[in-house]
A protein has these predicted regions:
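A generic structural signal for alpha->beta connector loops
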Residues: 11-13, 109, 147-149
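Helix-loop-strand module that forms the ligand-binding subsite of alpha/beta enzymes
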Residues: 48-136
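Short catalytic/ligand-binding loop motif for oxyanion handling, primarily in non-cytosolic enzymes
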Residues: 23-26, 76-78, 122-124, 160-162
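Hydrophobic/aromatic beta-strand patches that form the interior of the parallel beta-sheet core
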Residues: 15-17, 113-115, 151-153
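Short, glycine/serine-rich, charged loops/turns that create anion-binding
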Residues: 21, 119, 157
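N-terminal beta1-alpha1-beta2 submodule of the flavodoxin-like/Rossmannoid cofactor-binding fold
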Residues: 1-71, 78-80, 84-87, 91, ...
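Glycine-rich phosphate/pyrophosphate-binding loop and the adjoining helix
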Residues: 124-180
Length: 180
C-alpha cells in the first residue's frame, strides 16, 4: 500500500514506524500522569524520553495526510504495541476534545488505510460482530479522532492452508492497487 501510494505521489515523504521492532511502553499511572499533567507537575527525568517519543508519534500522526496501519489480528483484537501507540496519540486537545455536545474529533481531513491480516475468516460471517474487535476498534478510534476516510484491506484466512493463504494475499494485494 505504501509503495503504491508513493508511485502515485512521488513527492510524498514516508515515515515508517515499526511498533513491533520498537514498541512504545504501555500506559501506566505514572506515564498517564505525565501525559495529562496537573498544574505544577514536573515530569521526572526518567519519563522524558517517553514523553519525547509520545510527542514524536503524535506529531507524525497529526502531520500525515495518509496513515497506513498494518494490523494483524491477535486473539480477536489488535497487538498490544498498536494499542500502546493509540494510547499515545489519543490526546485530549490534540486528536479530540470534549464539548457540551460530546466528543469532537480534531484529526480529520486525512485518509487512514488499515491493512489487516487474520488467520481465520471474520468479515461477513456470524463471527464478525461477536469476535472482530480489531477492525471495529480501529474504525471507532479513528472515527473518534474525526477521521471518516477509512479503507480496510483484509488478508483473511491466512492460517487456513496454503491455497487459502495465497488467495487471501492475492486479494489483499489487488485491494492495495485499487486503494492507491
Amino acid at each position: 500500500t505504501v509503495y503504491q501510494l508513493q508511485e502515485t505521489n512521488p513527492g510524498a515523504s514516508v515515515i515508517y514506524r515499526d511498533l513491533a521492532e520498537t514498541p512504545p511502553a504501555h500506559l501506566d499511572g505514572v506515564l498517564l500522569a505525565a501525559l495529562r499533567p496537573q498544574e505544577g507537575y514536573v515530569a521526572p527525568e526518567s519519563l522524558r524520553a517517553e514523553l519525547a517519543l509520545t510527542e514524536a508519534m503524535l506529531s507524525e500522526f497529526l502531520a500525515a495526510d495518509v496513515v497506513v496501519i498494518g494490523a494483524p489480528m491477535y486473539n480477536f483484537s489488535v497487538p498490544t504495541q498498536l494499542k500502546a501507540w493509540i494510547d499515545r496519540i489519543a490526546q485530549a486537545g490534540r486528536t479530540f476534545r470534549y464539548t457540551a455536545q460530546g466528543p469532537e474529533g480534531l484529526a480529520g481531513g486525512k485518509k487512514v488505510v488499515i491493512v489487516s491480516s487474520r488467520g481465520g475468516m471474520y468479515a461477513g460471517t456470524a463471527y464478525e460482530g461477536a469476535m472482530d474487535h480489531q477492525e471495529a476498534f480501529l474504525r471507532a478510534v479513528m472515527g473518534f479522532f474525526g477521521i471518516t476516510d477509512i479503507t480496510v484491506i483484509r488478508a483473511e484466512g491466512i492460517a487456513m492452508g496454503a491455497d487459502a493463504r495465497a488467495l487471501a494475499l492475492d486479494k489483499a494485494l489487488n485491494q492495495t492497487k485499487e486503494c492507491a
